[in-house]
Amino acid sequence: MSEEFRNTYITKMSENLALLRTSINLTQERLAELIGLSRFTLIAIEKKQRTMTWNTFLSLILVFRANEKSRILMETLGIYTAEFRELLIVEDQPKKTC
């Protein structure tokens, strides 16, 4: 997966983070706790003063896709797309024989 691909999704999530968070009535403090960030870091990301990491993005996906309302909102906003969901599928690879 390319850096450009990651940055596109990170940007979409960053731009809509406060909307997604409030759509499921999470405080900044609670969301930060759920994803392992400080509240101050989360606030900086919401204010676009700090860039979100890929690991933070993936943690947010896990939180928001667990709730139907925020999952649908992520789909509508182009954050949780079919293309992205395909990346989450790990298929068994055939075992190599020596």
Can you describe what each PLM-predicted range is?
Residues 1-23:
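A short, Lys/Arg-rich alpha-helix, primarily the initiator
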Residues 25-44:
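Short alpha-helical DNA-recognition segment
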Residues 47:
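Short, conserved catalytic or interaction motifs in soluble domains
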Residues 1-4, 61, 66, 92-97:
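Surface-exposed, interaction-prone regions with an acidic/low-complexity signature
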